[in-house]
Amino acid sequence: MNDTQNPLHGAEASPLGKPVAYRDTYAPELLFPIARQLKRDEIGVRADALPFCGEDLWNAYELSWLNPRGKPVVALAEFRVPADTPRLVESKSLKLYLNSFNQSRFDDAAAVRMAIARDLSAAAGGAVGVAVWPLGGQAERRFAAPEGVCIDDLDVAIDTYQPDPTLLSAGDEVVSETLYSHLLKTNCLVTGQPDWGMVAVRYTGPRIDRAGLLRYIVSFREHNEFHEQCVERVFCDITARCRPQRLAVWARYTRRGGLDINPFRASDRDQRADEAMEIRQ
């Protein structure tokens, strides 16, 4: 896919919130890439000096195609899009793209995996990792909270529902800990539909004030932005306000349209997100 076949637009030009005709034969042109830099400019992130590394992990639950004899195959899939790719893929377009496999014939799951990897890599502008598992072929998934401290039971008053980094602060004592909250709610950049999820913050550095962190997380409640952009905003705000020596931020959003999106951003390449799935996924 090149930019003349599928030119880059802002999110407002995407299929989100618009009636579309569903295609059931393979159509890679349905993928709609959006330049990450359009929103990174808002938080002072330069493409040539990213303050983080990481990836966007997508889980796909509604993937099907026909085998060479016309019999349907169903499968699960996982996509790992590096955070340093220049483009993200809009989620409704990815759903429409995956639906286009429904009446298309492929030799086997490996052929499907190769097609998806080729198309997503072209859309994102970098190598995207793809795994496809026919049912029963994937390791059992683990549902659990992150290893850390849930801050949701703190008794705090809250009246701010747009992102406010001034709610964040840190003390003098240096600690290593993971804090997380299930109270994350953001909204689709285009449609305003609510997106629900868990967000975790793992850091080494001055102790982050937990009440302030909870207020800050809740302050995204009326904010319209894509999942990936929200996590990058959280990472940058905590970096600026709390000055951690090491930091990782990840979110696990609930499923929509047969897909869930789980962005992960970290200060160091040796860090990994907890692979356990959020109970609402």
Curated annotation (Swiss-Prot):
It catalyses: 7-aminomethyl-7-carbaguanine + 2 NADP(+) = 7-cyano-7-deazaguanine + 2 NADPH + 3 H(+). Pathway: tRNA modification; tRNA-queuosine biosynthesis. It holds the Pfam family QueF_N. Substrate binds at V89, E90, S91, H227, E228. Homodimer. Its EC number is 1.7.1.13. GO terms for biological process: queuosine biosynthetic process; tRNA modification. It is found in: Cytoplasm. InterPro entries: GTP-CH-I_C/QueF (IPR043133), NADPH_dep_7-cyano-7-deazaG_red (IPR050084), QueF (IPR029500), QueF_N (IPR029139), QueF_type2 (IPR016428). The active site is at C188, D195. Catalyzes the NADPH-dependent reduction of 7-cyano-7-deazaguanine (preQ0) to 7-aminomethyl-7-deazaguanine (preQ1). GO terms for molecular function: preQ1 synthase activity. This is NADPH-dependent 7-cyano-7-deazaguanine reductase. PANTHER family: NADPH-DEPENDENT 7-CYANO-7-DEAZAGUANINE REDUCTASE. It comes from Azoarcus sp. (strain BH72).
